C-alpha cells in the first residue's frame, strides 16, 4: 500500500507525508516527504504505529496526519496484479542494472531512494515513447524536465523495467550500488492479457 497525506491548513513547512509499505522494515513508524529529498523520518505517531489494511488507515497525533481541527487530504493506492506494483529494489551501480519485475509493461514509474536522501524521479511512456526512457520529472522540485539520456536511466520491458544507470551520483541516481529504492509503477499493458496472450516489449 502507498498513501499520500497532506495537512491543507498547516502554515509554512507543510508537506505531503508518504507511507510506502516497502520503505523500511517498520513502515508504520516511518514516512517520507513528497515535497523534498530528505531521508526517511522515524516517527511512530504519524500512522499511530499501525499498518493500514485494505479498508482502514490509522493516523496518530501528528501535524502531518491528524492535528486536531485541521483539514487533511489523503490519497491511497493498493496493488492490483497486472495493473499496479509498489515495491522496492537494491541498486547495483552497473549499466547492466537491476531488473525490476512488475508483471506488466509500465506506463508510469516513480522511484525514490529510501535508504538515504534522494529525489522522487518520474518516468513515463508518453514523454519517452520508446527506450531508453530518460525524460525525468522530479515530484519534489519545480525544475524543468531533465533529459538523462547520456546516463541511460532505464528501459521499459514487457514485464517490468531495467535500470541502465551507473554514472549519476547522489540524489539523481536510481541505481547506486547497495542503495535501496522504493517505487510506484502503473501499467500500460499486463504481461499477459485477459486472453492469455503475452504483450510485446517496446
Question: What is the predicted function of each stretch?
Answer:
Residues 1-202:
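Surface-exposed molecular-recognition determinants
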